[in-house]
Amino acid sequence: MKLVLTEEEQFLKDTAKNFADERSPITHFRALRDNNDPLLWDKDLWSEMTKLGWPGILIPEDYGGSNFGITGISVILNECAKTLTPSPLFATGVIGAYSITNYGTEKQKEFYLPKIVNGELTTALAIDESSHHNPADTEIIAKKQGSSFIINGKKTFVIDGASADLIILLARTSGIKGDMTGLTLFLVDANSNGIDRRKLDMADSRNYANINFKNVEIPDSDILGDLETGGETIENILDIGRIAMASEMLGNAEAAFETTLDYLKQRKQFGVLIGSFQALQHRAAEMFCEIELTKSSVMGAMKAADEGSNELQRLSSLAKTMAGETLHLVSNEAVQMHGGIGVTDE
């Protein structure tokens, strides 16, 4: 496994960097947040991303995509994360595209995938029912009734849940809470009768929602994958999501580190640049080392996904864990090393 980007992947990364820097600086996201934008992402910006083909990176060419792989979509997310580019790319271009491509029926692929590629359809993955993430704790019920299922229950903290057109829902068709068997994935039209979505205001200003399902009827043709194989399927989908999220968090950490490094080279205290203080140099060096280690971990997980490695689950979990810890370290250190200006929002 070579932990380097191919020429094509590097080109994609460079394109994403230029796009994010020019079309979506951090000030763009702050404006959406401060103006209480209901979507918290820009439709015009999403349209531009669609023209670049980003929602179709994981989708086969037969359905209009480019089939560029997990590495391709991850390097885009990495660059977009550096400027906090607001978009449904993670929930739709990663989770939605991967789920339907790998587990959808031919009819489902033909219907949904071209719409994802064209930017006509956004998706959201609804799995959690409390603040604790554990798919096995699924209690929302999908009860068989003729050729349909009746859905009752709730989902919480659904990313892009307030705006998505299609909900990928994990529900229980048999068994009890805590059991990974008896779970089934469904493709649910977000505008179906009986669905109530409540947008949440979160600290990171991302688009989340709580979703209630009351006697929502969906045909059995809308099962994603096979009946009661949802436990195994969702684990694979989450592995891919972990890699994409790790790449995003790495981008956040890289941007925070670069901003801090620039500040150390400009800010003077006691008549000298604070970057000349050895204690701050040591702290900056630690951040640099952790970021470089995380890069290798994330790259390893991306390549494992594209190569179909049996180590995917382990490497994806490792990448997300390392990225989370590194981002926590760097963001905390960035605030501390900026001093008082580090806790302002302007």
Task: List where the protein language model places each region.
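Alpha-helical interface subdomain recognition
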Residues: 1-87, 103-108, 115-120, 135, ...
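Short Ser/Thr-interspersed hydrophobic loop/turn segments at strand-loop and sheet-helix junctions
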Residues: 53, 74-81, 171, 187-192, ...
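Helix-loop "lid/cap" segments that line or gate small-molecule binding pockets
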Residues: 95-103
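A short, Trp-centered hydrophobic/proline-enriched beta-strand micro-motif
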Residues: 119-128
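Flexible, small-/acidic-enriched active-site or ligand-binding loops
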Residues: 137-139, 189-220
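A short core secondary-structure module
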Residues: 152-196
